[in-house]
Amino acid sequence: MMKRFRLLSVFAVAIVAIGTLLVSCSSDDDKQEPNTITNNKGTYKITSAYIMDLTDQYSITLTAHPGNGVKATILKTDIGKRIDLSKRGRWKADSPTVVANGEVETLQSGSYVHVKSYANGQISISYCLKKSDGNGSRMEKGNYSGSIRYGTFQNP
């Protein structure tokens, strides 16, 4: 009887965890505070934003303290498009929570980067990164709308 109860308990926890991952990134900015990054450690205010021109791509870095941030690299032609990170492509995502290179791997369904606009030193971006592997399930999401500096290399 105890084995059955224990198995049911583990199964219930797994269902709740999977359900949380599936709905966590359901929409661009559902219940996400403006200009923040949220991961399994908490929610952090974005303190700076940088963009680098890499010929046919942009590398966008959003930093938040302490030690949180994200760097997304996308094609310039993808500005205004929602990029599905569960499909291969010329994109990269790098954060302390999730790292992926779209040319060699993909992220879980529901993962995306959406640079809604970039012009005149202003940017609007939202993203959700979900990955499950031998290290467990991880999720990070964020959004930022505001000024962005053209800069040199920045670690997230």
For the regions a protein language model found, what residue spans apply to each?
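Bacterial N-terminal signal peptides that target proteins for export
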Residues: 1-12
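Bacterial Sec-dependent N-terminal signal peptides
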Residues: 4-5, 17-45, 150-156
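N-terminal non-cleavable signal-anchor helices
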Residues: 11-17, 24, 116
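Intrinsically disordered, low-complexity serine/threonine-rich segments
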Residues: 12, 29-30, 51, 98
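Surface-exposed helix/loop patches within compact recognition domains
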Residues: 42-120
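C-terminal or internal capping secondary-structure element at the end of a domain, subdomain, or sheet
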Residues: 116-156
